Amino acid sequence: MLEIHDNDISILKDKKCLILFYFTATWCGPCQKIKPMIKKLSDGLDADKCEVYMVDIDENDELALELKVKAVPTFYLFYEKKLIDSCSGADILKVHKLIKDNLPKLEKEIIID
């Protein structure tokens, strides 16, 4: 899992894979609870197909405002610079489904423990 700093989302420019933004905060209990599960999910993904970026809303407040993040944890999925799907809450199965449902149909199923 990578991190976004200084409200910089230039990584969206040239990516040809799914990009998952995990909006979080250090003071958010549910965010801290799901963080290791998101890390494990991220580690199990093929980086050519999907990359996961953690975005601390306190460090990246302009970005959170621009993208209208209203709660944490929130997950935004981008493809070719466009927001294509999202979900909120500390539910790893929801996040897994968000990614799986948006991978190309030929993609093998992502398996999480």
Label each PLM-derived region with a short phrase.
Residues 3-4, 23, 35-38, 42, ...:
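Thiol-based oxidoreductase modules, predominantly thioredoxin-like and allied folds used
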